[in-house]
């Protein structure tokens, strides 16, 4: 009898849980940028895993030269995704129940690219060499070290 039941089989996502290895994808027109590490793919909110970018409105620099480093990081992410479809594999969830994902656009690893271009810090060891190269090359937010958010300067 169990063979008969198994023969009919129920879809594994019957109750809304997609298989863990299925990526979440969105066409370019369905992508929203919230900040330098968070994007919307259709109705899903994804935080890029393994990186930390300044939040929108996070001021950096001296009193004489204030800048919105969060807006710069968001603009960096928008430039990477410009006109491209995105696919993300969810690796877990954060405290806000956002999916933590590794994302690809145009064959490019977006998480690594944000670090490589100097718009995010590496929070996993495999990306640290990219962070060092961005800092040494003064890319992105590293271009003017006096403008870095305080927590970045402590690293």
Predicted feature locations:
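Small beta-barrel nucleic-acid-binding modules, primarily SNase/OB-fold domains
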Residues: 1-155
């Amino acid at each position: 009898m169990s063979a008969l039941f198994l023969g009919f089989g129920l879809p594994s996502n019957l109750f809304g849980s997609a298989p863990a290895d299925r990526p979440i994808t969105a066409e370019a027109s369905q992508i929203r940028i919230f900040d330098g590490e968070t994007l919307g793919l259709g109705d899903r909110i994804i935080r890029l895993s393994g990186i930390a970018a300044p939040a929108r409105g996070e001021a950096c620099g001296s009193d004489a030269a204030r800048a919105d480093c969060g807006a710069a990081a968001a603009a960096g992410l928008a430039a990477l995704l410009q006109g491209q479809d995105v696919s993300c594999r969810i690796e877990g969830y954060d405290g806000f129940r956002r999916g933590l994902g590794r994302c690809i656009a145009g064959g490019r690893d977006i998480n690594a690219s944000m670090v490589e271009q100097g718009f995010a810090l590496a929070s996993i060891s495999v990306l640290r060499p990219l962070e060092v190269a961005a800092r040494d090359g003064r890319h992105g937010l590293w271009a003017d070290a006096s403008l870095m958010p305080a927590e970045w300067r402590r690293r």
